[in-house]
Each structure stands twice: as C-alpha cells, then as structure tokens.
C-alpha cells in the first residue's frame, strides 16, 4: 500500500502540467521539478509579409493539444557594433558577458511573438498568485525571453512564502519593432514592439487565471530597454492602462530606464534612419519604400539593419530604433506626459546602477580633448543651443576625478574624456532621468534604489546591466533587492515585507529631508540621499527636449 502511494505521488509530481485557455484550448507544459513551465506559446500572428512592421494581430489558430516545452526563437536581432572587448580588463569583460544584454540572441526569426508562463510546482487554476511580467532589455536592438530564465526567482518566491507566477513576452526589436519615419506614422504602425508587449499583457489578462495567476495582481518589470518599456506603458494612452474595463497591471518596477528622450516618430532622425534602411535594402528609389521593405527577404532586411548605427556605435545612445511619440498612444514627449500627470496611477520602484554610462562610453574613445568632447555633444544633441552645450560642459567638467566610474579619482580614465562622456550618457539616459520622474510623479507610492556594488571594478565600475547577474544568480546584497524586495513588492506592494534588515524609505522628492534611496554596495544595504550632481540635473533637464535624440 505504501509503495503504491509513493509511486502515485511520484507520478503526480512528474506529470506534465496542463492549462485550459480562455478559448477552450488545452495546452501542455513542462514539469521541471522545481517549477512548471509553458514556453513559446504564440500570442500573435507571425508578423511577416504584409504584417512586417505593422501592429500585432492576436493569434487566431488552435493550440488545443499542443505541447509548449521550449522557448520560441527570439525576434530578429541587430548585431551591436563596437570593440569594447579590446578596451576592458578580463574581470569587467566577464561580468559584461554574464549580463547577456549586449549581445544578439539566437536562434532568431521574424515569427517570434510568443509568451512564457513559469509557475511553482503544483500550481492550479484558482491559486490566484501574483504575476510578474518581465520585459527584457537590449537597447531596443537585441534580446529575447530565453536569455532570462526565471527559475531562481520562482524558487526564491517559494522560499519566502510569497510564490509568484513569472511571465515573459517576446517583442520585435530594432527595425522590425521600432522603425520610425513619415511613412510609419501615416500608416499608424509606430512603436510596434511596444504594441507586441501590450498585446502580451492582454493575453495575460485573458488567460493567466488558467495557470493559477491573478490578473488583478500583475506587476510589469524590466531592465534597460525593458525598464523604459515599462515607463512607456505607464504613459501609454495618457495613462489609461485598462483592458476590458480592468487595469492590465497594478504596479511597475524599472531597473535602469525611465522616460525615453526621443523626438517624434516623424522627426528628422527617424526619417534619416528610415531612408538609410531603405537605401541599404535596395528600396531607396522605390515609389513606396515601406512596401518595398516589406517585400525584401528576411536576410536582406537583416543585412540592411546591421548597416544602420547600433548602440555600440560612435553615436551610442542616439539610437536608430527606439520608442517615439506618435501622437496616438504616446501622445506627447514623455517628459511632458510625466509633468502633466498623464500616467497610470500605480506604485513603482525605479532604480539605477551608479555608472550607467561607462559601457556606452567605450564607443567614443577617439574623443580626447575638450574641443572634441564639445563637438561630440553637439552632434549627439542637435537641438541643444551653444549656450546649453556650454552649460553641460561646465556641469560635467573634464576633471577626470568627477567623471564615471564615479568616486574613483584619477583611475579608470581610458582617455581624458572617457569619464566625462560616460557621466553625461549615464545621467541623461538613466540615473538623473529617474530623478526627474520621481520629482514629478504623484501617481502612487514610490521607492528608488542606487547600486554601487561593483565600485571597484576596473574601467566600468557599477555598470549598466550588471544587476541582471545578481538577479539571475542570487549573488550578493543586490540580490536582496532584485529578488526578495521585488517579489515582496509584487505580492504586497511594499518591498519592506521582504524582511530586509534596512527599511526601504518611500521617495517623496529629491529634496525631502530624510533619506530617500535604498543604497546597495558590496557590504550590504543602507539608505542615502538622491541629491548628487544637481548641476548636471539642471543642465540636462531644465529643458528636456534640448537633449532629445
């Protein structure tokens, strides 16, 4: 009798999990013992042929009886340019490679719009677990869901007594997902990659209950481009995040990324990149360039895309492909939307790494003098006046002891201008943009963090995306934030229920009297003030559009 019972228990544990979707289709997943996974589920029609560059169309085929046990291919990737390997010591390079954010993901395909659901073992419909929906990063040029398996986070949530369901969604990147220009705006196809993410959220709203998730307890979170994507969804439709009369998400977590400092979709640079892509693909003289681009082979479009500037090119964060105001879903520049209160009213966590710009600074090592730095900034920020560039140069001086990686004195100056440029890129794209958001956002409880965990790492310091390493491998004090606190926030809307030894203060403004940041270093957690580099903040954000790209 005991043997029969034991065999029955083993069989039940090993049985493949199933879920019945809203349309009645029953699908089978993978029992991975430490979790159950449904991987590579289509949520949209393949965006190929006439659907290339267009809004995603909900998947209409039958999935009944199918098995979903492996990740689908990533969406097509743009190979990043750059020679950073030549300029970094091994210790820094090893961590960069572990972060997996700066490299193309293979295999890739245009037929890529799939979603993944991973849950604790034994979870059934009706469990009503909180849901964490992950949006991967990669500069809006690379990335895929297969790069960030959530096994560690699921296991940690179980150990905390706060089990969660993890969802990740593939979305189109680079030219396939974020092509801009007059033709794209006229057709209404701007920001297709964001629309992929949004459709994935709608799929979750319709189906996650079948997997044991609670559609009213969804937290969207992401890193880098994923973090900026979370911000875009907070601002989407002037903050209307409802679907079928209910919110798609109730909270947001942003790791290294806030408002995208981007011109409109029909702005000068978006049109320049559209024309360059068309020319590269042999469509430059076509009467309908967009139709021509839809007609070229996947390989031709990939080659054409790879010959437009990537995020490791000299132009760096002046990205070829990124979310842009379209007048429809992103109705204005994102800084204006935040100032005007046009956002979803939800609690948020938003934070950064201390040296967000160093990795990107390796792309401009030929800039070595003050005059060259000034010209670099003028080329990067074409809307800024001479006076604004002068103010920027004063706020971020050539003194290498004040540059990034910060607090390293005369060390880590690859060139006389490397630390200056790294400081500007990091503050504009990430660290001080976060402060701008927090100073203007009143939609819900706010928490913020800043990590200095790798302050001793040569050249890069606590560089952009290093948090992924600590998040995936449960290492160091950073993991207490990126796993424990995030899980607690998704469950209770309060990171302090994670039982951290240091209480995480709420953020009211950068000038509040008490501490407002959770700080992370190699020794542990502590609190601090968000009051550094005020001259840089004023230079960059007194008139944000001056530094749009």
Curated annotation (Swiss-Prot):
Cysteines engaged in disulfide bonds, as pairs: 75-112, 283-292
Ordered alphabetically, the record's keywords are:
Disulfide bond, Glycoprotein, Hydrolase, Lipid degradation, Lipid metabolism, Signal
Glycosylated residues: list them: 329, 366
Signal peptide interval: 1-15
SUPFAM superfamilies for this protein: alpha/beta-Hydrolases
**Any one GO BP annotation for this protein:** lipid catabolic process
Q: What reactions does this protein catalyze?
A: a triacylglycerol + H2O = a diacylglycerol + a fatty acid + H(+)
Q: Name one GO molecular function term.
A: triacylglycerol lipase activity
Matching InterPro entries: AB_hydrolase_fold, CarbesteraseB, Carboxylesterase_B_AS, Carboxylesterase_B_CS, Type-B_Carboxylest/Lipase
> From what superkingdom does this record's organism come?
Eukaryota
Pfam families xrefs: COesterase (PF00135)
Please state the Enzyme Commission number of this protein.
3.1.1.3
Name the enzyme group at the top EC level.
hydrolase
Tell me which residues this entry annotates as catalytic: 224 (acyl-ester intermediate), 356 (charge relay system), 464 (charge relay system)
TM region(s), chain numbering: none
- Say which family it is in: Belongs to the type-B carboxylesterase/lipase family.
Q: What protein am I looking at? A: Lipase 1
Organism of derivation: Diutina rugosa
Gene that encodes the chain: LIP1
């Amino acid at each position: 009798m005991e043997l029969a019972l034991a065999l029955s228990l083993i069989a039940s544990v090993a049985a493949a999990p199933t879920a019945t979707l809203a349309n009645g289709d029953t699908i089978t997943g993978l029992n991975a013992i430490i979790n159950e996974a449904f991987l590579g589920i289509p949520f949209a029609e393949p965006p190929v042929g006439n659907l290339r560059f267009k809004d995603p169309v909900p998947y209409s085929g039958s999935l009944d009886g199918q098995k979903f046990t492996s990740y689908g291919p990533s969406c097509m990737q743009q190979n990043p340019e750059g020679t950073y390997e030549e300029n970094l010591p091994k210790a820094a390079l090893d961590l960069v490679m572990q972060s997996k954010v700066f490299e193309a993901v293979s295999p890739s395909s245009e037929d890529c719009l799939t979603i993944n659901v991973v849950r604790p073992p034994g979870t059934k419909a009706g469990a009503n677990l909180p849901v964490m929906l992950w949006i991967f990063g990669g500069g809006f040029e690379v990335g895929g869901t297969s790069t960030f398996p959530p096994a560690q986070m699921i296991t940690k949530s179980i150990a905390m007594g706060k089990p969660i369901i993890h969802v990740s969604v593939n979305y189109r990147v680079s030219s396939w997902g974020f092509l801009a220009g007059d033709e794209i705006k006229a057709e209404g196809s701007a920001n297709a990659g964001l629309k992929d993410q949004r459709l994935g959220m709608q799929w979750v709203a319709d189906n996650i209950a079948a997997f044991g998730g609670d559609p009213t307890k969804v937290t969207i979170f992401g890193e880098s481009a994923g973090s900026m994507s979370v911000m875009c969804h907070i601002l989407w439709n002037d903050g209307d995040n409802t679907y079928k009369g209910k919110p798609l998400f109730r909270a947001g977590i942003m790791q290294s990324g806030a408002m995208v400092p981007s011109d409109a979709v029909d702005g000068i640079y978006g049109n320049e990149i559209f024309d360059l892509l068309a020319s590269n693909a042999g469509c430059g003289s076509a009467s309908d360039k967009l139709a021509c681009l839809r007609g070229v082979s996947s390989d031709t479009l990939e080659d054409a895309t790879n010959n437009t500037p990537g995020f490791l090119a000299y132009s760096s964060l002046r990205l070829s492909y990124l979310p842009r105001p379209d007048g429809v879903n992103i109705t204005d520049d994102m800084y204006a939307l935040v100032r005007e209160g046009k956002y979803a009213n939800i609690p948020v966590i938003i934070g950064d790494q201390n040296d967000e710009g160093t990795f990107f600074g390796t792309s401009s090592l030929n800039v070595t003098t003050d005059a060259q730095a000034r010209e670099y900034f003028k080329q990067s920020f074409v809307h800024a006046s001479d006076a604004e560039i002068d103010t920027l140069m004063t706020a971020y001086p050539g003194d290498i002891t004040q540059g990034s990686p910060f607090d390293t004195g005369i060390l880590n100056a690859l060139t006389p201008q490397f630390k200056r440029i790294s400081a500007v890129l990091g503050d504009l794209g990430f660290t001080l943009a976060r402060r701008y958001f927090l100073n203007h956002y009143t939609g819900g409880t706010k928490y913020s963090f800043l990590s200095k965990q790798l302050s001793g790492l040569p050249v890069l310091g606590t560089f952009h995306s290093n948090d992924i390493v600590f998040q995936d491998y449960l290492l160091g004090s950073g993991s207490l934030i990126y796993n424990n606190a995030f899980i607690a926030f998704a469950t209770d809307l309060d990171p302090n229920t994670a039982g951290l030894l240091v209480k995480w203060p709420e953020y009211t403004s950068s000038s509040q009297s008490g501490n407002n940041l959770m700080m992370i270093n190699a020794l542990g957690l502590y609190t601090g003030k968000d009051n550094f580099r005020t001259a840089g903040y004023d230079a960059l954000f007194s008139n944000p559009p001056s530094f749009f790209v």
